[in-house]
Design a protein with these regions (language model features):
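Flexible, glycine/small-residue-enriched loop-and-beta-strand segment within the central core
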Residues: 9-22, 28-96, 122-123, 128-138
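Conserved active-site beta-strand element of glycosyltransferases/polysaccharide synthases
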Residues: 119
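Acidic/histidine-enriched, glycine/proline-rich intrinsically disordered or flexible terminal extensions
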Residues: 135-148
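Short glycine-rich donor-binding/catalytic loop of glycosyltransferases
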Residues: 106-107, 112-114, 124, 130-131
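A transmembrane-helix-recognition feature enriched in membrane-embedded lipid enzymes
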Residues: 1-8
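Outer-envelope exported proteins of Gram-negative bacteria
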Residues: 43-45, 49, 100-106, 116
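Beta-rich strand-turn-strand
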Residues: 87-111
């Protein structure tokens, strides 16, 4: 059955717009939206969980002006190597997520996430440092000063 989603090499149930750069070994789950219309680079070895949406454009100004502002805003998204995006996370235009970062399920990423950082919530906020030691991974809580 044809569901109307253009074919792509990652997942038959992922909607990929434009021509994003996706590194080797990256896994893309079902029901994802990868918007490459404003420039999207996803590094190697990432997991983009089911239901993740990554946007590189916004039609807010066009919409609220009744189309008096005809432009669609666009800004690239950059995702580093070995980044995990949890189920149903949303990444908004203009964001950079550093290498080995972890974004929790349902998080909405509106600003940059540093490398090796766990970010959760709406909006996504850094809560822990990701420490990788061989095959072991641990999350070291950040001090509350990060939220001020």
């Amino acid at each position: 059955m044809d569901h109307g989603i253009p074919a792509n090499p990652y997942n038959p149930h992922a909607w990929i717009i434009g021509e994003p750069s996706i590194g080797p070994g990256t896994w893309v789950g079902a029901f994802t939206v990868l918007d490459g219309s404003g420039g999207l680079a996803i590094g190697a070895g990432c997991d983009i969980s089911c239901g993740v949406h990554i946007y590189t454009h916004s039609t807010v100004r066009r919409c609220v002006t009744g189309r008096a502002c005809p432009e669609v805003d666009r800004a690239p998204v950059r995702i580093g190597d070995r980044v995990f995006l949890g189920a149903h996370a949303v990444v908004l235009m203009g964001v950079t997520i550093g290498d080995q970062a972890v974004v929790g399920a349902g998080a909405v990423v509106c600003s940059d996430i540093p490398a090796r950082t766990l970010a959760v919530g709406v909006p996504a906020r850094p809560t822990a440092r990701v420490v990788v030691d061989g095959s072991e991974v641990r999350f070291e809580p950040l001090h509350t000063a990060v939220f001020s």
